[in-house]
């Protein structure tokens, strides 16, 4: 884990992103919040029904943890899959949890190409439109958290 390896102390990150399976809302998911490593949680989802269901479960868990003094829900990020009524479904999810969609990521073949090349997209195609979408999302997350990205 990051804690056991001393990563928090060594790197002192402003933002840490945990990618967890949406259908597994369990102790591993909540540990960063309970240990004080998270102030805000952002839920990423597409408009697919199972993804919406999983995102709702995570948002509900975050709301329960917030009531115990842990992290709060910072917003929803739409990872587009181009399914029917996608925007509408995700907007309804955000409304149900009194939050907002803070970012939208278009579906991109470049992401899969980067993965096949063993790189992250910003390394694989730093000047691409998709890389710009990720930078914009980073700025939006920092804005919600009350921070700014250094120039």
Report residues per predicted region:
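Conserved catalytic-core segment of NTP-binding enzymes
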Residues: 4-10, 15, 20-104, 113
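Conserved Rossmann-fold dehydrogenase catalytic segment
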Residues: 110
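Active-site donor-binding loop signature of nucleotide-sugar glycosyltransferases
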Residues: 107
